[in-house]
From Swiss-Prot:
Record pathway: Purine metabolism; IMP biosynthesis via de novo pathway; 5-amino-1-(5-phospho-D-ribosyl)imidazole-4-carboxamide from 5-amino-1-(5-phospho-D-ribosyl)imidazole-4-carboxylate: step 1/2
Domain of life: Bacteria
Family per record: Belongs to the SAICAR synthetase family.
PANTHER family attached to this UniProt entry: MULTIFUNCTIONAL PROTEIN ADE2, SI:DKEY-6E2.2
Keyword Ligase: yes
One BP annotation, GO: 'de novo' IMP biosynthetic process
Protein name: Phosphoribosylaminoimidazole-succinocarboxamide synthase
Catalytic activity: 5-amino-1-(5-phospho-D-ribosyl)imidazole-4-carboxylate + L-aspartate + ATP = (2S)-2-[5-amino-1-(5-phospho-beta-D-ribosyl)imidazole-4-carboxamido]succinate + ADP + phosphate + 2 H(+)
Transmembrane region(s): none
Enzyme class: ligase
Enzyme Commission (EC) number: 6.3.2.6
SUPFAM superfamilies per UniProt: SAICAR synthase-like (SSF56104)
Organism: Rhodospirillum centenum (strain ATCC 51521 / SW)
Amino acid sequence: MTRRRRIYEGKAKILFEGPEPGTLVQYFKDDATAFNAQKKGVITGKGVLNNRISEYLMMKLGEIGIPTHFVRRLNMREQLIREVEIIPIEVVVRNVAAGSLTKRFGIPEGTQLPRSIVEYYFKNDELGDPMVSEEHITAFGWAAPQDLDDMLALALRVNDYLSGLFLGIGLRLVDFKVEFGRLWENEEMRIILADEISPDNCRLWDVKTNEKLDKDRFRQDLGNVAEAYQEVAKRLGIMPEAGPGDMKAPKLVQ
């Protein structure tokens, strides 16, 4: 196995130097974290499933003209992505009350919101990813007003498309978190969708039973986390070729 330069390691993924300039290899780990990494665990096969699910959803979004960093899947756990300058803001789109929203406003979980609500969080683990306003983002220079307009428009388009896609397979898109990056091409800069889209950063409930098929199973100790992720992949029609058995993590060369 060739040694690769590790660029960055996050809670659920590792970024390696890519084979050509302007690319990176995104490796999906089995590590699971919740509550800003206060709770940690390992879910065997999660990385494989998230790689496939994110590939599928990024490709689908690309087909409707949403620019993403995804280039192609390389193997069970890795995908080739475009190197972008990540904007340190998490964009959360909420359709149904869940998670921190229920605590902040005393709304019962599962309440359909009057309309989709968009929130921004500053990506900073030490500070616990605080919620911020558009004013904070532009005043502190994390993103320009035009960047923010683009991010909002893209996030709402992603929500519209994915809500319909998931509804078609019997899942309700309760809420999700996305990240964006700046891609520079010939002196031109554009905002594109980055990171991943998977049950790690989407809340997905079964339409009929309200069963949770996402990372809340880990957060809330509901059990059967891998099985829930497999169910999402199965409904999308993309279970890994080898089935859930072939999901052991390969040994990483340090």
